[in-house]
Amino acid sequence: MNYTTSQEVFLRHFFTNTDSDVYCATDAMPMALWAFLEGGYSRSQMSMRDRFLKVFEEISEKDEDAPTIEELADAVARSRLPQLDGAMRKASDFMSKWAVEYGHNSLKDSSVDRFALENVSQRAAKLLEHSQLGAFQEKSTRYLDFSADDLVFPPSLIASAYGEESRWQSRQMMVAYRELLDRMKVHFEAVLSRRDFKTEAAWMRTAHAKAFDVARYLLPCSVRTSLGATMPSRETERHIAALLASPHEEIRALAQRMRDEAQRINPGLLKHVQPNPYLERTQGPLAELAANLRWERPAEAKEPVVELSWISPDIELLALSSALCATERLGLPTAAIRERLRGIGPSNLADIARAALEGRGPHDEWPREFAVGQIGFDLVLDFGAWRDLQRHRV
């Protein structure tokens, strides 16, 4: 399509080009509007740029107060951002009516929500990060000093018979953290040679990072932290619905605030977020059933324990048959390939594995075809070690 000068100016503010079949949205494109536009591919023969223009043309036809494309282009040229923001909100509202008929869920995958969650407890942070599709960055216990940070306790805990004891124990752990941190700084400054570092700042930074790495295992889960979270809107809806059903009041309160803030910037796709009733109904009865089993517990572990709990049968054959099937040279289903692999001997199996893996570099993921089966472990460890493992979720 040939665009007018005004259309060109307007489009170039929201897309990287107007003359190619491959283009990106710029940062000026509202996330929800992008999701609606992307979803439009399934219902329209028009290009995304043309559909984008058509939205504003239809709005101006139905609303005489709405700006025309020419007026919007002038707003772009003169950097009149409030006028553009108002037009974008109208466009998102306009498209959300179409989205109701289309169906929401696949559109939510194309929209991303971003949260800043500050001054929450580390216990809450671990539950907030319990999402496979979310991306999280948390205040680092390895690089930042938590000595001056306050502690966060749920009001119900403080009001309980355990409230004073909980606060006292957490305060004692913070005292121990500060003392150990100071001692470890002195220790690592003594054992790390200044000559091995280009600058004094680099030497000091490394010594202190090693000190934090040791002392952080004493931090109680009630210490304050902050984190950022980014996730697709479908996952935002699922995750907040699960958090709203949490038995922990701090989590429910945070989830309500997350929902309120997310609906301010993404009302069209997140208007129906409610507590997950299945989780609300299930958690209590299942916990009660488990408590009533009264099975004998093993002796409490005196040190960390790692035990292999289960492994999928034939997991190596599953991976190799999947890799061979992906070559599209055998014309056999994976089940048939797996049965044939049983009879070819260990050396031939090793050859297949080598062919699939020997070109893998230090930064390459495992082949996708190897994402088969499961390996489960039972771990007994302290909160600090679990916190380190949890941040490497998959």
Roles of regions detected by a PLM:
Residues M1-V394:
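A conserved ligand/cofactor-binding region detector
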